[in-house]
Swiss-Prot record:
Name by which UniProt lists this protein: Ubiquinone/menaquinone biosynthesis C-methyltransferase UbiE
Range of residues in the leader sequence: none
Catalytic activity: a 2-demethylmenaquinol + S-adenosyl-L-methionine = a menaquinol + S-adenosyl-L-homocysteine + H(+); a 2-methoxy-6-(all-trans-polyprenyl)benzene-1,4-diol + S-adenosyl-L-methionine = a 5-methoxy-2-methyl-3-(all-trans-polyprenyl)benzene-1,4-diol + S-adenosyl-L-homocysteine + H(+)
Function: Methyltransferase required for the conversion of demethylmenaquinol (DMKH2) to menaquinol (MKH2) and the conversion of 2-polyprenyl-6-methoxy-1,4-benzoquinol (DDMQH2) to 2-polyprenyl-3-methyl-6-methoxy-1,4-benzoquinol (DMQH2).
Residue runs in coiled coils: none
Organism for this UniProt entry: Marinomonas sp. (strain MWYL1)
Pathway participation: Quinol/quinone metabolism; menaquinone biosynthesis; menaquinol from 1,4-dihydroxy-2-naphthoate: step 2/2; Cofactor biosynthesis; ubiquinone biosynthesis
Lineage: Bacteria, Pseudomonadati, Pseudomonadota, Gammaproteobacteria, Oceanospirillales
Molecular function GO terms recorded: 2-methoxy-6-polyprenyl-1,4-benzoquinol methyltransferase activity; demethylmenaquinone methyltransferase activity
Domain of life: Bacteria
Entry keyword Methyltransferase: yes
Keywords: Menaquinone biosynthesis, Methyltransferase, S-adenosyl-L-methionine, Transferase, Ubiquinone biosynthesis
Pfam family, one: Ubie_methyltran
Length: 251
């Protein structure tokens, strides 16, 4: 957990001044934005689409709801949510990175999804929305890049309606030692090489692999959600714990 007085924080395996992390992460995503979707498909063999589909199925979102998709990037979840909430509902795709927002906005416009979706550049630690606004909040593969994760979770709790739920889809800790070893080899050898080949950027993908290892494990993240007020918190391991879906409610 981050402390307001802490002067340094992790950036992958490096320690950098806390006030520099937002800029450093922004540079990574400015670099990868244009190739983000194709790299996701290549890196996961397309499995990320199944993880996201499962997240949607656990959201409870229905017609007329108001949904916040934090770190929504290129809009994979927003596309699905826009269809679920219909013309009477709204989805806000929020991302701190304007390059990712532009890719997401263009992608959705090309699919004709414009009426019930709004794009907002926002920091998850200080969400610019009133209290008790959203029926559901999701953050998929974004929380590990946030500097102060507890502050971000508290901000999400504040803007969630009573009765609403938060879903956090994120890389986590594999359940078996063998899977962990195989995953390490893939992450630190193959992933940067793919980044270099496809996006001409090995360093950004090396950071993404390192950031996964620095992210809190399943039980730690569940505890962090409990601490800021979420109730009935739980998590489900997907693909052997390579990814976990955390769920929490506000009552």
């Amino acid at each position: 957990m981050q402390d307001d007085q802490k002067k340094t924080t992790d950036f992958g395996f490096k320690e950098i001044p806390t006030d520099e992390k937002v800029k450093a992460v922004a540079q990574v995503f400015h670099s990868v934005a244009a190739k983000y979707d194709i790299m996701n498909d290549l890196m996961s063999g397309g499995i990320h689409r199944l993880w996201k589909r499962h997240t949607i199925s656990q959201s409870g979102v229905r017609a007329g709801n108001c949904v916040l998709d934090i770190a929504g990037g290129t809009g994979d979840l927003t596309v699905k949510f826009s269809r679920l909430v219909g013309s009477e509902g709204q989805v806000i795709l929020a991302d701190i990175n304007d390059s990712m927002l532009k890719v997401g906005r263009d992608k959705l416009a090309n699919q004709g999804i414009v009426g019930n979706v709004k794009f907002v550049q926002a920091n998850a630690e200080a969400l610019p929305f009133p209290d008790d606004t959203f029926d559901c909040i999701t953050i998929a593969f974004g929380l590990r890049n946030v500097t102060d994760k507890s502050k971000a979770l508290a901000s999400m709790y504040r803007v969630l309606k009573p009765g609403g739920r938060l879903l956090v889809l994120e890389f986590s800790k594999p359940e078996s030692e063998l899977l962990s070893q195989v995953y390490d080899q893939y992450s630190f050898r193959l992933l940067p090489a793919m980044g270099k080949l496809i996006a001409n950027d090995a360093d950004s993908y090396r950071y993404l692999a390192e950031s996964i290892r620095m992210h809190p494990d399943q039980e730690t993240l569940k505890g962090m959600m409990d601490e800021v007020g979420f109730e009935r918190t739980s998590y489900q391991n997907l693909t052997g714990g390579i990814v976990a879906l955390h769920k929490g409610f506000k009552f």
